[in-house]
């Protein structure tokens, strides 16, 4: 192989590496994000009965900047439990004005039957679940 051909292949290889690194670092989040001040989280949205019932069940892990946003049809008192949830979670209830009305920290996976219910006295339209220790 001639030196010129080797040089062209090397340059193309370097360009491919630079593009790949740039693309990986510059990927924008496709899904919705929820922010508390400067702390932002990519969230999966649970806005149907099936999605809200399933939630984060049977997940073995959750990225440190990820969570699940539960959206209800109307403001109300929505209890949660940790049935079949494998990771500890923080839960944040928000009203229709997106104001935090209650925080439950470090909800543990359910090992009892029946599982205990996590609730509060207020009214919420949204609940966000994040890794325990995040809220």
Q: Could you describe each region identified by the protein language model?
A:
Residues 1-12, 21-23:
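N-terminal Sec-pathway targeting helices
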Residues 19-135:
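Compact, glycine-rich, soluble single-domain proteins
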Residues 15-16:
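Accessory terminal and edge-of-domain segments that mediate assembly/interaction
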């Amino acid at each position: 192989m001639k030196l010129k051909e080797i040089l062209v292949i090397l340059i193309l290889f370097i360009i491919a590496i630079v593009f790949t690194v740039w693309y990986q670092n510059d990927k924008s989040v496709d899904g919705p994000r929820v922010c508390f001040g400067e702390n932002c989280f990519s969230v999966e949205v649970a806005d149907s009965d099936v999605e809200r019932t399933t939630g984060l069940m049977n997940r073995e892990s959750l990225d440190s900047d990820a969570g699940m946003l539960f959206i209800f049809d109307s403001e109300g008192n929505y209890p949660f439990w940790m049935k079949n949830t494998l990771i500890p979670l923080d839960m944040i209830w928000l009203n229709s004005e997106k104001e935090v009305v209650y925080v439950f920290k470090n909800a543990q996976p359910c090992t009892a039957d029946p599982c205990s219910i996590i609730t509060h006295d207020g009214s919420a339209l949204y609940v966000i679940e994040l890794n325990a220790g995040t809220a």
